[in-house]
């Protein structure tokens, strides 16, 4: 039985995956309209990657140019400006906050996401949910490194931690870090775990 639950954010706590994807489209649609359809297909298949990797991919694999660091940094900042207010307003995943409040004395909660860390903290504070999480970690540090950092900082026992995420990248990061994983969403997204839930009611059952 785990004593610590590590949550992803987008698609697990808040229904914001579409907001995030549309932010990338808005970032480039005026400058590179001919590239948007291909980029949208890529984004749908890779929602769990950080914005830095998605921006790099756009330049290197779709535009086929080597971008300067200054351009990547500016695009990441512009992307944040586009999406932050919409993510703050996005609805919670049904049952997420009820689950967290109900089980606050049962589990310690942390949040480790591929979203930018400073932006993520700002969003959580604006939504008044930062108080539920002992750690809120994000990019540009990669997710598996943040998981390992969390384990070290807490001196936690790996067998007592479970990560709840909605993408194959969450699954890979958790399992490569030696902690358990529960998929949230479509079973077809995950290749290495049998524990997949679609609702917080199902998550509660699986954790009993």
Locate each region found by the language model.
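Asp-based, Mg2+/Mn2+-dependent phosphohydrolase catalytic module
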Residues: 1-3, 117, 123-208
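Short helix-capping segments at alpha-helix termini
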Residues: 30-35, 63-67, 128-132, 155-156
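A short helix-loop-helix "switch/interaction" segment in the helical subdomain of ASCE P-loop NTPases
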Residues: 44-46
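Helix-loop "lid/cap" segments that line or gate small-molecule binding pockets
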Residues: 25-29, 50-67
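Active-site neighborhood of HAD-like aspartate-dependent phosphohydrolases
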Residues: 1-41
